[in-house]
């Protein structure tokens, strides 16, 4: 239902499609998504919140111990839900160049 709403309402924008693709390729942190896509934080984080609200993305905080060990703030992990994976597939069909735009987390472009 949400996927149909996204597709029909035009809310499956380039920005949302790029963020979904980045998540599908293993980028889990907002900063990583910003770095690989070139999108600013004022675009990425509100989009991630909307995607989470709409059930396409889930998030969780990393263990505080890891952040303390690395002397930095804790990061929030974002992952695609089942519906998010469906939306990413639809995004790839709608915007086929996404497959060449973002390298996967391990360095190869798919």
Provide a role label for each language-model segment.
Residues 22, 80, 87:
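Conserved SAM-binding loop
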Residues 25-29, 53-54, 84-85:
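Short, charged/polar surface micro-motifs in flexible loops or helix N-caps
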Residues 36, 78-80:
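Short beta-strand element of the conserved SAM-dependent methyltransferase core
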Residues 1-8, 83-110:
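Amphipathic alpha-helical dimerization/coiled-coil segments
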């Amino acid at each position: 239902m949400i996927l149909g709403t996204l597709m029909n309402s035009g809310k499956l924008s380039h920005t949302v499609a790029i963020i979904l693709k980045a998540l599908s390729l293993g980028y889990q942190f907002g900063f990583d998504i910003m770095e690989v896509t070139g999108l600013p934080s004022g675009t990425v984080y509100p989009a991630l919140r909307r995607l989470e609200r709409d059930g396409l993305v889930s998030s969780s905080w990393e263990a505080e111990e890891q952040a303390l060990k690395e002397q930095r703030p804790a990061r929030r992990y974002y992952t695609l839900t089942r519906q998010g994976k469906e939306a990413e597939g639809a995004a790839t069909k709608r915007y086929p160049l996404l497959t060449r735009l973002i390298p996967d987390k391990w360095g190869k472009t798919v």
